[in-house]
Structure formats: C-alpha cells, structure tokens
Amino acid sequence: MATVSRKKKKVKVTPEGTVHIKASFNNIMVTITDVLGNTVSWSSAGKNGFKGSKKNTPYASQITSEAAAKEAFDLGMRHVNVLIKGPGAGRDAAIRALQGAGLEVRSIKDITPLPHNGCRPPKRRRV
C-alpha cells in the first residue's frame, strides 16, 4: 500500500546565520546554517539542473546561491557570515548573489585548506 507523503514543516529561524560555500573544480555547494550549525537550506549546481563542465561556472554559482538564499530569506534569515572553501570559479559570483537575494553579508572568511607540503599533487594535464 502506498504511503502518504507529508510535506516537512518549515520552521522560522533566527535572523543570523552562516553560509558555507564549497567551490571545487567540478561543482559548487552552498549550505546555509543557523548559529548552532543546523542546516536551514542548501543547494548545489547539480540540484539546479547544471550538468558536466557547466557546474563549475560563475553563472551556476550565482543560480545556486540565489536558490539557497531565497529559501533562507523566506524562513526569516537576514544577516549572514560567509565561509568560502575551495579554488572554484564562482566564488565572487556566489557572494554577490547572496546580497542580491536580500541577505546582509557581515563578514567573508576564506577557509580553504592549504597543505604544508602534504600529499603529492596529481600529475600535470597535457591538453
């Protein structure tokens, strides 16, 4: 017998939060959390319909950030601190999209992990 799917209740959140942007070489992921670290909304380039090499473009980054920010804004979030991780192409576009969606960006922090000569990097590409 088929079960009835229930829509998850959306709970109003505090007006402050944190935006975690992970911009890798292949994809971009945006997660918006409250002050305690509980996820309020999230989005990725693949979730928004981008496939393959189009996932790592500034445009995909902009659309992804807007989608996550819009959902958080509707739940009551207004002020955010931004944490950026990774070397991806759309880092700046993601921050501009957050501001365009109505969230006030209070601080921007780059938390990209840098090795102190750790693992050997992959071989150079020959195109």
Curated annotation (Swiss-Prot):
Organism placement in taxonomy: Bacteria, Pseudomonadati, Chlorobiota, Chlorobiia, Chlorobiales
Biological processes, Gene Ontology terms: translation
SUPFAM superfamilies: Translational machinery components
Coiled-coil region(s): none
Sample GO molecular function, one term: rRNA binding
Zinc-finger recorded as keyword: no
Protein name as catalogued: Small ribosomal subunit protein uS11
Family, similarity comment: Belongs to the universal ribosomal protein uS11 family.
HAMAP family per UniProt: Ribosomal_uS11
